[in-house]
Swiss-Prot record:
Family: Belongs to the UPF0102 family.
A Pfam family this chain is assigned to: UPF0102
Protein name: UPF0102 protein Dde_1093
Molecular function terms from GO: nucleic acid binding
Organism name: Oleidesulfovibrio alaskensis (strain ATCC BAA-1058 / DSM 17464 / G20) (Desulfovibrio alaskensis)
Disulfide bonds: none
PANTHER family tied to this protein: UPF0102 PROTEIN YRAN
């Protein structure tokens, strides 16, 4: 999946994290999952995305990194991080009385890189900012708006890649987000004891 978002005014790492979580959430929803919660917290423990994939509860960890970063998103899922995810998932299952539900841990890797707006986007943004009649004529001529493209491409059935664009100020840089979804990101037997099923933490 490829997602493009205009850069915001908040600190770069916070903006990148938010964009990464939004892209991950949109990707999972477009894949047919039902999003149950985002940024669920219990003390110092946190779950980025909790979703339902048919009858399975999915705890999705989102890792966002710059394209030229020294650490890949995969490497950020350390054994210590896995242990915290398992503890957080156990607390969520307990608080929602869902101990009997099968669950899994997924990893959504989001890689960001700066990218200038495409010529078509720049012309659309400039026309909108000017508020001219020419912009209205362009809209009426079938030239799709940026958000219209997002809806059609993001949720287009059978599309091998999905793209998401959101416009910002004219000539503003964008972030190109590349999203990779890894189901069953790690083996639960590494962290959990035995139960009625391998994923049950008791």
């Amino acid at each position: 999946m490829v997602a493009r978002r205009a850069a915001g005014s908040c600190p770069a790492h916070i903006a990148a994290g938010r964009l990464g979580e939004e892209a991950a959430c949109a990707y999972l929803a477009a894949s047919g999952m039902r999003i149950l919660a985002r940024n669920w917290r219990a003390g110092h423990l946190e779950l980025d995305i909790i979703a339902q994939d048919n009858g399975t509860i999915v705890f999705a960890e989102v890792k966002t990194r710059a394209a030229r970063g020294l650490e890949s998103p995969h490497e950020a899922l350390t054994p210590a991080k896995r242990s915290r995810l398992v503890r957080a998932a156990g607390m969520w299952l307990s608080s929602n009385d869902m101990w009997d539900r099968p669950c899994r841990f997924d990893l959504v890797c989001v890689t960001t890189e700066a990218r200038a707006p495409e010529p078509e986007q720049m012309s659309l943004q400039a026309a909108r900012a000017a508020g001219t009649a020419q912009a209205r004529r362009a809209a009426g001529s079938g030239l799709p708006g940026i958000l219209g493209k997002a809806a059609s491409r993001l949720f287009g059935a059978g599309s091998p890649q999905r793209s998401h664009r959101a416009g910002g100020a004219p000539d503003s840089p964008e972030q190109l987000l590349r999203v990779e979804h890894i189901p069953h990101a790690f083996d639960l037997s590494e962290s959990l004891g035995g139960g009625d099923a391998a994923w049950q933490p008791w």
